[in-house]
């Protein structure tokens, strides 16, 4: 099990394959993705690498984190993430990961924070059909209707689909295909959509379920 990478979402575009078909892709950019710390069995009880990406202003970095970056001899990073790895895949502190970490055709799991939509009703949030347009219904056409409760159990069960805050949640999309990489510009092109807005930090790992396909 090897480390993933931290990348930043640039946006979406399309590319053409050898058959002349256009393929929608999400463009991710890797910016100074380096190992800033390691975790070992002897010291921490598990093996992992902590990666940092992007650039952070020194004034916006805490004193403790400035000390950690100084020990690692790397510039302050805007985003940190830890990846569990096997012992033989531990990387040296300061090692920089490039877009060539992944190969074209490889399947990856992508994790990001979805775009927040604010408070949304049941029709938009869960695809409810709403109430009838006529026949006595007024004002509440887009309501979710009854929540299914009576004297017994006398409550609304937890996780009942209702109106509420939509989006702004951490989501992992599995088995997305890497269409191509550009190591010179630090770009990874992934087929399809990736959760998050433009500029969002994205975690890209080797797919864990690819063997089952």
Swiss-Prot record:
This is Large ribosomal subunit protein uL3. InterPro entries: Ribosomal_uL3 (IPR000597), Ribosomal_uL3_bac/org-type (IPR019927), Ribosomal_uL3_CS (IPR019926), Transl_B-barrel_sf (IPR009000). One of its GO terms (cellular component) is cytosolic large ribosomal subunit. The keyword Ribosomal protein applies. Part of the 50S ribosomal subunit. Forms a cluster with proteins L14 and L19. The lineage of its organism: Bacteria, Pseudomonadati, Pseudomonadota, Alphaproteobacteria, Hyphomicrobiales. Methylated by PrmB. One of the primary rRNA binding proteins, it binds directly near the 3'-end of the 23S rRNA, where it nucleates assembly of the 50S subunit. Belongs to the universal ribosomal protein uL3 family. SUPFAM superfamilies: Translation proteins (SSF50447).
């Amino acid at each position: 099990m090897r480390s993933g990478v931290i990348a930043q979402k640039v946006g979406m575009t399309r590319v053409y394959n050898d058959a002349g078909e256009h393929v929608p892709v999400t463009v991710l950019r890797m910016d100074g993705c380096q190992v800033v710390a390691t975790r070992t069995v002897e010291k921490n009880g598990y093996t992992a690498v902590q990666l940092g990406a992007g650039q952070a202003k020194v004034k916006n970095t805490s004193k403790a984190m400035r000390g950690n970056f100084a020990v690692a001899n790397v510039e302050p990073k805007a985003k940190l993430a830890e990846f569990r790895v096997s012992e033989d895949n531990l990387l040296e502190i300061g090692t920089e990961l490039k877009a060539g970490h992944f190969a074209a055709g490889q399947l990856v799991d992508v994790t990001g924070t979805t775009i927040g939509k604010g408070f949304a009703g049941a029709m938009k949030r869960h695809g409810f059909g709403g109430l009838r347009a006529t026949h006595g219904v007024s004002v509440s056409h887009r309501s979710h209707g009854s929540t299914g409760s009576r004297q017994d159990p006398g409550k609304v069960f937890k996780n009942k689909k209702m109106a509420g805050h939509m989006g702004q949640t951490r989501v992992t999309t599995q088995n997305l295909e890497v269409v191509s990489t550009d190591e010179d510009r630090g770009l990874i092109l992934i087929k399809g959509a990736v959760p998050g807005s433009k500029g969002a930090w994205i975690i890209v790992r080797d797919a864990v379920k690819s063997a089952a396909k």
